[in-house]
């Protein structure tokens, strides 16, 4: 058995001994499941727990070492001496270290927090923090966020005393240890933001911090000490300043409720303005007063008819078209002689240089709809596409099939002339297309009438025509024949 497994077994038996009700008797009652070495460690763990409890009450570390040695000797266990058990009580000989090793720290998390036995394992704190940790009413006192965890460090006695007093008001009934190496999350009701520090406490912490900064130490312990003290200082000062400066005066705008425009009597407006005497005006009256220098009139004045407008209205009242004699039009125009004419007659004369005939006169005025209707949009959308099949081939080329003439009787003579379109590629291609027309379809089992219908195409395929003739027309004609007659 190597040393690691032995140490883990010893740690398990040492922490489980309070629940089993003793060391030697419980080990003996197990039968053959527990070795004598574990039995001895069980009794040693029980004595260790008693000596550990005496430590929290004020006993010295030397007494605990003697107690452990006697317990190991009385247990009769072989294989471990006093030096091997240094992992359990070496932490108590040095008051500056307050953390467990990770393997033993996991075992402490298994202990129930509400255990009422006096042998419960308590956290390792040194003497200045013991007055508020050894309370008679709580079997397991919680640790504060500033003095527990792997990153905790030794601090000045007066600083720890002040921190202990601050932690007394935020204690909880039970707080279990975390099985992680980083510091545990503080309780909800004892977060650093909720801690209120007085002037004297703040001054004591500040003096300790300045003393540590003056030493100039660059070790990791001093650096972590600064981390421990700084949050309490910053949060305390922030809470003190926020407590004195958070006096929110959320009073509604009661003065605006009783305002009324002195000109129009309006009680609600986007923006209240003032006139020259300081009275309130609504936005409209205020703008009018600013632009015109006088109060805004409450009644909109009627449009004043000038002499010129009266004369023009009188002239237009008896105006009639010199051509069609109509009196209603959307626009009055003048002819070449200067006589007034309606819009229709004036446009007609402008376009044709002839007076508009009276037969075209209409009683109603026809207005032009400038919005495109859905039908006109559809018609415009069809334009610009490919020509229909009638653009390539005459509709007379397609006739009903005549069963008496075979399959090829449905084509006219002009249909066969389209075979020359395939010869616009190359002489070799023309020969290939000619063989397709004359012999290709015959090989597929077509009748003699089909071959006779394409005989002209076969004879024309040998001639070479210029390459300027479109090739896609021949392909499209054959594509339409295949889709329509297969």
Curated annotation (Swiss-Prot):
Major subcellular location class: nucleus
GO biological process, one term: motor neuron axon guidance
Native organism: Drosophila melanogaster (Fruit fly)
SUPFAM superfamilies the UniProt entry points to: Glucocorticoid receptor-like (DNA-binding domain) (SSF57716)
Gene: grn
Biased composition, class Gly residues, residue ranges: 20-34
Bilayer-spanning residue ranges: none
Alphabetical keyword list: DNA-binding, Metal-binding, Nucleus, Repeat, Transcription, Transcription regulation, Zinc, Zinc-finger
Protein name as annotated: GATA-binding factor C
InterPro entries: Transcription_factor_GATA, Znf_GATA, Znf_NHR/GATA
Top-level lineage group: Eukaryota
UniProt keyword annotation of Transcription regulation present: yes
Skewed-composition ranges (Low complexity): 40-65, 236-251
GO cellular component: nucleus
